[in-house]
Design a protein with these regions (language model features):
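A short, N-terminal "cap"/entry segment at the start of jelly-roll beta-barrel domains
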Residues: 22-54, 130-190, 278
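A short beta-strand-loop-beta hairpin characteristic of the jelly-roll/cupin
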Residues: 69-98, 204-228
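Conserved short histidine dyad/triad with adjacent acidic residue
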Residues: 54-71, 183-200
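Conserved hydrophobic/aromatic beta-strand scaffold that supports enzyme active sites
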Residues: 55-59, 77, 93, 101-103, ...
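Double-stranded beta-helix
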Residues: 117-161, 245-278
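Bacterial Sec-dependent N-terminal signal peptides
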Residues: 1-24
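Sequence termini and other peripheral, non-core segments
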Residues: 23-38, 43-47, 51-57, 65-77, ...
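Conserved metal-binding segment of the jelly-roll/cupin
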Residues: 96-115, 226-246
């Protein structure tokens, strides 16, 4: 009589190794309630998840104007996701509404002010530039790097992608070659729908759930809900996908942080939707 212990043991070991290799999906909810009697709130989100990237959730209210400066060797990205206000950069005022992106670029200091009786919430994303980033930055078009980049998400260029359904509206809110190795966009649809499983080991990725977002994110054998106003890190190299149930909303920002400039070839999978001639 044959003993099946080696086979059973082998299956057990494979299953155990798969479990050990499965990476949890880090996600952190962003509180939209300021502490009592406070007019300013700042918290580091998903600390040390991505090398060279520091993310803060900042909330402002009240009449005071806040000054913010870019540290040497860094570039800043502001993603405004709730509330209204104004950013002033070199004497120019930029109206801030929910779902606006702003990059100071060569402007060293900006002023932020909240609209009366409102609270402004945003992510402040600092990217530490490597020596190669500094070299690459010099080759970028000057119009990309010397002026403030400011866009409302709805004004940004739409694109299609094979992993998404025709019902999905995708937009590039920050093209590459503005800040080295970074690009950002949005994904918006109503369920039932999905983003098909895919892998991109050449980049780190964050998702920011926008208003009413209510989806499930899968990465290898793990899954987690992603709700509105939450930040999630896709485990590097994982096969990941997103689903949304009937009558629910999928609406999030993807943020790509490429390991090197060669990885930006991935963006060629995005097919720009040409505007029809009027």
């Amino acid at each position: 009589m044959r003993k099946s212990f080696p086979v059973v043991l082998g299956v057990f070991l494979v299953t155990t190794m798969m479990s050990l290799n499965a990476q949890e999906i880090p996600v952190e909810n962003l509180s939209t309630d300021l502490p009592l009697y406070s007019q300013q709130y700042a918290k580091t989100i998903l600390a040390d998840e991505i090398k060279g990237i520091h993310v803060e959730h900042i909330a402002l209210t009240g009449k005071n104007t806040i000054l913010d400066a870019t540290e040497d060797g860094n570039k800043l990205i502001y993603l405004f996701f709730k509330g209204n206000g104004t950013v002033t950069a070199e004497g120019t005022d930029y109206a801030i509404v929910p779902e606006t992106i702003l990059l100071p670029n060569a402007v060293e200091e900006i002023q932020l002010k909240t609209t009366a009786n409102d609270t402004l919430h945003y992510l402040r994303i600092a990217s530490k530039l490597s020596k190669q980033d500094l070299i690459d930055l010099e080759t970028f078009p000057k119009e990309n790097t010397q002026h403030v980049y400011y866009k409302k998400f709805t004004d940004c260029e739409p694109y299609t992608e094979p992993i998404k359904s025709p019902n999905t509206v995708s937009r590039t809110i920050m093209p590459n070659k503005i800040i080295p190795r970074i690009a950002m966009g949005t994904v918006q649809t109503t369920g039932p729908d999905k983003v098909d499983p895919h892998e991109h080991p050449m980049l780190e990725q964050l998702f920011l759930g926008l208003s009413e977002n209510d989806v499930v994110v899968y990465a290898d054998d793990e899954s987690t809900p992603l709700n509105e106003y939450a930040l999630l890190h896709i485990p590097l190299g994982s096969s990941h996908s997103v689903t949304v149930e009937k009558e629910k909303v999928m609406y999030y920002v993807w943020m790509d942080f490429f390991l090197d400039a060669k990885g930006e070839e991935w963006l060629k999978t995005h097919q720009v939707i040409e505007k029809e001639n009027e």
